[in-house]
């Protein structure tokens, strides 16, 4: 969940922003970036790198 701490003195708590569009955008961004993350060895947390390895997308041919 995306949250923003309000900085005005009269604010009480945290404002929560809707994520309808951000979830879709994040998915599209990861779809593009995951192959590069997996090649670099940094994608395992966010990407399904094992599936990409099984498809032989990372061969040196």
Swiss-Prot record:
Keywords noted in UniProt: Cleavage on pair of basic residues, Disulfide bond, Ion channel impairing toxin, Secreted, Toxin
Keyword Disulfide bond: yes
UniProt subcellular location: Secreted
Recorded GO MF terms: ion channel regulator activity; toxin activity
Gene Ontology CC terms, in alphabetical order: extracellular region
Tissue localization of expression: Expressed by the venom duct.
Residue stretch(es) of the prosequence: 1-19, 52-61
Keyword Secreted set for record: yes
Top-level taxon in the UniProt lineage: Eukaryota
Post-translational modification: Mostly non-hydroxylated.
Stated role: Probable toxin that inhibits ion channels.
Domain remark text: The cysteine framework is XIV (C-C-C-C).
Protein name from the UniProt record: Conotoxin Am14.1
Annotated source species: Conus amadis (Amadis cone)
């Amino acid at each position: 969940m995306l949250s923003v701490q309000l900085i005005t003195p009269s604010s009480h708590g945290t404002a929560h922003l809707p994520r309808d569009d951000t979830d879709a955008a994040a998915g599209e961004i990861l779809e593009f970036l995951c192959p590069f993350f997996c090649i670099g060895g940094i994608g395992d947390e966010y990407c399904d790198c094992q599936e990409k390895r099984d498809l032989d997308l990372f061969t040196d041919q």
